[in-house]
Amino acid sequence: MRVFNNAFASVMERVGDGEFQVPSAESKFVGTADQEEFVISWLRHICLPDPVHPEAIVSSLYYDTPGLNSYHEKTGGDFIKTKCRLRWYDPDLSADTALRTTYLEIKHKIGQGRRKSRIRVAVDRGWLDTAGLDHPEFHAILARDAPSLGESLPSGLMPAGVVRYRRRRFICPFTLSRICLDSDIGLGRINERLLSRLGPVALGTIVLEVKDGAPAQIPWLSRLYAAGIRQRSFSKYGACIASLLKEA
């Protein structure tokens, strides 16, 4: 177990410390909030806790075009999807209490395959926690740091909204796949120059993600399927914006 923990931690540090491209496969399983207690109990019984970051609150600021092209890619079921986001975590990873560690991420998805590039960006903590999404620094981060990732992006991207959720991480003992259970998914701040605030958005949905592994090779997933959890495509950003726009 010690060898496994050390090896896994090494990979996570490489992903977290700078620019890195991660080609991988990802499958999602979706359920309702009232199934959360069963799912988390089953994961704790059958899986290993993530040895590096077992739990966090994840905040993701999504960039989109004035025509919400990224949102429409997701809701339209496009086979090829691109998303750009600025992500941060609680507890924070920065040793400096005045700063927050964020990651500018560009993620391309083709079917179930995905490639994610990201770079670490340190920002002022107080500013990030309180700034309106029309603040020019959000665009400056994108203009300054995205080119170093060597990725093509749609023109006219601007901050759209912050999706926030609780993430609990596990390792499948059979395949060493990374397993994430996301719950309490909702939309926080929005850019009111792009979207109208029509009320709070809280999805009554849980999402189980299987990363770097084929679901057919994971025997314990059948128990979740029997409980009503279903494999399907799901975008937290897409679902939150659809709920905001009353299109869900």
Protein language model annotation of sequence segments:
Residues 1-248:
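Phosphate-end processing signature that detects enzymes handling 5′-triphosphorylated RNA
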